Amino acid sequence: MQETTVKRDGASPSDAGTPATTAQGLGKLYIRTFGCQMNEYDSDKMADVLRADQGLELTDNPEDADVILFNTCSVREKAQEKVFSDLGRVQHLKKQNPNLVIGVGGCVASQEGEAIVKRAPYVDVVFGPQTLHRLPDLIKRRRAQGVSQVDISFPEIEKFDALPPPRVDGATAFVSIMEGCSKYCSFCVVPYTRGEEVSRPFDDVLLEIADLADQGVKEVTLLGQNVNAYRGAMGDSGEIADFAMLLEYVHEIPGIERIRYTTSHPKEMTQRMVDAYARLPKLVSFLHLPVQAGSDRVLAAMKRGYTALEFKSVVRRLRAARPSLTLSSDFIVGFPGETEEDFQKTMKLIEDVGFDTSFSFVYSRRPGTPAADLHDDTPQDVKLRRLQQLQALINQQAAAIAQGMIGTRQRVLVEGPSRRDPNELMGRTENNRIVNFPGVPRLIGHMVDVVVTHAHTNSLRGRVAGIERDTSGAE
């Protein structure tokens, strides 16, 4: 789980631009985002719709805001409790600004609904992931009626038709192609908070990406809870496009030079998807493929729908199609009933497959899920020890991959100034590694060849190919 203040690609919230004058006047919007890239995308859309309708511009200071929104994540219990903690910290701002609107969106909102208002009666608006486009009306009704507004319905794909055109800042962009999940893993709340899988129409996705390309976007990341389960309607023909077909068409859009996607499910990795890595050079050599565990017994209890051997078979076919492919994954340690033998099978899978990074956590019980009723007698200290061992192994594998990149020439999309040194540049390799290097601002938004000179824990350092070798080793 991660948390951010909403921002555009390559820009901080304070870089959002000069507020525009509208019929509603000037105003400031503060959004705090918890969780996944889907939530980051949704936060961007909240900003878009409130800018278009009410002239609100982003601020990174909640004390300056006229509207404060928390876009929440319910995957883990700690994330859920942190939302209420943060809500308490902004409650006093209502005394300073009686017209301040405080809203809660995202998966906690979808799960808790009116209970949020009962627990925190100063919250004005509660909305789900599928009703963020209704934010302007919810805020207007709250101000007109003086009553908290709650809308956590699942109106299919309606929100995409109601959202304003995407605003581009930088050479990268997220594009949501589907919503929800129909897998119903025993530990997961997503099907209950975001609804079942619903895919956007094929043509709508392509038109949005083409529009982004016209505005200078070179890299798109296709988003979905199970993005490779995409099944989009093709016009009025009644035909359905699968995810592999969508990738093939996106690959042909002029101006798009890189394609990423997240999050995928091993069960949906069809042979046509595997073949795409051999046929589509714009598809990056990096894949996030959650496995969760390496024990067949635990995988069955999780209702993941595959065995460890089947997962490894998918990886083997992918790497046969694209030998340079690097993988990241998700792991849950301490799932109810996990034995030491089960855990060692997970460690063996990690050793056999090799990962570049992972999102790994101790199991967090989520009320309302089937796993919440399972008996869990594993001590917390044992779970934490297992998590540390797992993370240490993956960190070791990641370090080896980074060391192996030293001296190689990497194609890098330059995203902006380096966070460590604003006089330098930062970009990403195909395999999703951050590279810091000396360069001039005109390179931002362009692809450049960078020779990797040093490997650090969370980043690489390099020099633009053809420029005198950098020997500083600074991060």
Curated annotation (Swiss-Prot):
SMART domains documented for this protein: Elp3 (SM00729)
Superkingdom assignment: Bacteria
Entry EC no(s): 2.8.4.3
Main location: cytoplasm
The Radical SAM core domain, residue ranges: 167-400
Necessary cofactors: [4Fe-4S] cluster
Record's keyword annotation contains Repeat: no
Domain MTTase N-terminal span(s) in chain numbering: 27-144
Chain sites annotated for binding [4Fe-4S] cluster 2: C181, C185, C188
Compositional bias of kind Basic and acidic residues: 1-10
Function: Catalyzes the methylthiolation of N6-(dimethylallyl)adenosine (i(6)A), leading to the formation of 2-methylthio-N6-(dimethylallyl)adenosine (ms(2)i(6)A) at position 37 in tRNAs that read codons beginning with uridine.
Name under which the protein is recorded: tRNA-2-methylthio-N(6)-dimethylallyladenosine synthase
Source organism of this protein record: Bordetella parapertussis (strain 12822 / ATCC BAA-587 / NCTC 13253)
